[in-house]
C-alpha cells in the first residue's frame, strides 16, 4: 500500500505548492516530487549573508533513534555541548548583525549555549524557523520504519506532502523557510544573518537558493545517523554552515 497524498488537507498542499512556486520550484500533485522550473525569476535575497548553526548533537543521534520536537531523547550529549560551545567562541569573526532561532526546545537550548558567551548580536525567536517534526516516530529506529509506506514516501521517494499524522512534511519545512526569507528581506536588508535551527532547515534553504542540483539530489536516509555505522559520516551538529 502506497502513501496517499489525499490524506493531507488540500489547504496544506496548496500552501506548500504556492510558496515553493515563488522560488521557481514545481511540485507534482500526485507524487509530491519537486523540480526546478528552468526559465523563472526567483525573489532576490536582500541580506548580505546567511549562515546556519544546527542544534547540538542529541541523545537520539547517539542512540540511532528518531526524535520529535519534545521527546525525552532530545537532550544533548556532552560532546554535543562541547562542540557548540567551541563554535560559539568563534562567532566574532563572522560579524553577525542578528541571530534568528527556531522555537523547539533543542534549538532554543542550543541558542542558550551560544549566548552564554557574550556575542555582538541579539538573538530573536522565529516560529517559522521550524524543521521536521517526527511525532509518531520518536524512539524508533530506522529498521523499525524503513519498510512502512509513509517512511518510503517521505525519506526515499522525497514526497513533499508526506508526514506523520501529527508531524510535518518536507514541503512544509521548505514553505516555512520561504516565509523566513520574506522576514529577512523585510527586516534585515544588508545584514549578516545567523540562523540557529535544524538540519532539515539547512536543506530547505539550500533547495530554495539552488545550492542543490537537482533540488533533491540524494536520499535523506543516506546521511541519517539512525542508519548503520556513523563513524565515517560528517557530524555537523552545533557547527556553522554558509547558506548564502
Language-model segment annotations:
Residues 2-119, 168:
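Active-site-proximal alpha-helix that buttresses catalytic centers in soluble enzyme cores
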Residues 2-49, 132-144, 186-191, 206-244:
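Acidic, low-complexity terminal tails and accessory targeting/binding regions
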Residues 101-102, 175, 196-197:
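Short beta-strand scaffold positions
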Residues 90, 113-117, 183, 187, ...:
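Active-site catalytic microenvironments for nucleophilic, acid-base chemistry
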Residues 59-63, 71-75, 116-176:
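Phosphate-handling substructures
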Residues 51, 124-127, 241:
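General small-molecule cofactor/ligand-binding pocket signal
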Residues 56, 199-200:
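Active-site metal-binding loops of divalent metal-dependent hydrolases
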Residues 93-98, 186-193:
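Surface-exposed helix-capping loop/turn segments at secondary-structure junctions
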